[in-house]
Curated annotation (Swiss-Prot):
Family from the record: Belongs to the UPF0122 family.
NCBIfam families named in the record: PRK00118.1-4 (NF001068), PRK00118.1-6 (NF001070), YlxM (NF045758)
PANTHER family documented for this protein: UPF0122 PROTEIN CBO2450/CLC_2298, UPF0122 PROTEIN YLXM
Source organism (scientific name): Bacillus thuringiensis (strain Al Hakam)
Purpose: Might take part in the signal recognition particle (SRP) pathway. This is inferred from the conservation of its genetic proximity to ftsY/ffh. May be a regulatory protein.
Pfam family, one: UPF0122
UniProt cross-references to InterPro entries, sorted A to Z: RNA_pol_sigma_r3/r4-like, UPF0122, UPF0122_fam_protein, WH-like_DNA-bd_sf
Organism superkingdom: Bacteria
Stated name of the protein: UPF0122 protein BALH_3477
Amino acid sequence: MLEKTTRMNYLFDFYQSLLTQKQRSYMSLYYLDDLSLGEIAEEFDVSRQAVYDNIKRTEAMLEEYEDKLVLLQKFQERQRLVAKLKQLISEEEHVNEEMKQVVEAIEKLD
C-alpha cells in the first residue's frame, strides 16, 4: 500500500496540471493530506462512493499519462544514474572537477 501511495504521489506531482480542479482537490486531500473517503465526501457534500469513483478514475488517468509520457520513469532513471555517478566519483581519488560540476548540474535539473 505504501508503494502505491508513493507512486500516486509522484504521478500526481508530475501530472496534476492535466487534471480538473475537482480531481486535484480529491487526490490532494486523499493522498497528501491523508483524509478518508468519508471526510472528503463530507467536505464536498457528496457520497463516499462518488469520492471513491473519482479517485479511482483519476488514478487510472495518471497511470495512462505515465504510460504515454513516461516522466516518472525518466525521473527515476535520472536519479539512479546520478547516484551511480556520485558513487563512482567518491571511489575515485582524483576526479576531474569539471565532471563533478556536470553531476551537480544534472542534479539541479530535477
